[in-house]
């Protein structure tokens, strides 16, 4: 193995062990939170709301909750790891290691993808016996899953690089990630919104991630699957380019 490959494998192992050592917090807790949302909203809205013909509200809700958990936990994994390394001062050991910016980028993102894949599989394992879902377009489903998870992992890495203390990460989470994920069509179809909010929803990249993921289950969505895939792909490329530029320059990492 080359020095870069060894550096990548070591950093990836470190990041995986970081979330695996506290599995109750990083995987079990998000699953419990999502199941509680499902129980509360399913009981409150079942029979009163239906987005698609032949699809119950509980079925409609579940893919959105899975994707919301994926979005929030992918962001949390990379952002918390980066800011923790910066605040504690051990980022210097990563920067001194024989690992390039691309390998560093891939290691952080891959660890976040592994974490949210565990979260999604656990949620499906717990809920599918009670809320059966069709899998109409599995390739579309998988594509949107990894685009969304990758985008938020990269966005979390950017936030961790920009932030100088834990409060900055909390601000980004509470004022950007949480509102954007809640207002992205998780609990409702955007067709039920007034015209202004309907069009405003289309400015939210999280909406396309969730809507496209939902299409993978039902073969139906609020916008065409290719549109969601295009927007999600463009968002991933944009944030990845910005993050790689930051890592290459060592912005707020070396100085």
Task: Say what each PLM segment does.
Residues 208-218:
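Transmembrane alpha-helical segments of integral membrane proteins
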Residues 32-41, 57-129, 156, 175, ...:
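Hydrophobic alpha-helical transmembrane segments of multi-pass membrane transport proteins
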Residues 43-45, 160-203, 207:
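Transmembrane helix segments
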Residues 101-173, 220-244:
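Alpha-helical transmembrane segments and their short interhelical loops
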Residues 4-20, 213:
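A short amphipathic helical element positioned immediately N-terminal to and/or at the very start
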Residues 77-81, 85, 154-161, 192, ...:
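Membrane-spanning helices that line or support transport/gating and their immediate boundary helices
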Residues 4, 18-85, 132-141, 171, ...:
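Transmembrane helix-boundary elements of multi-pass transport/secretion proteins
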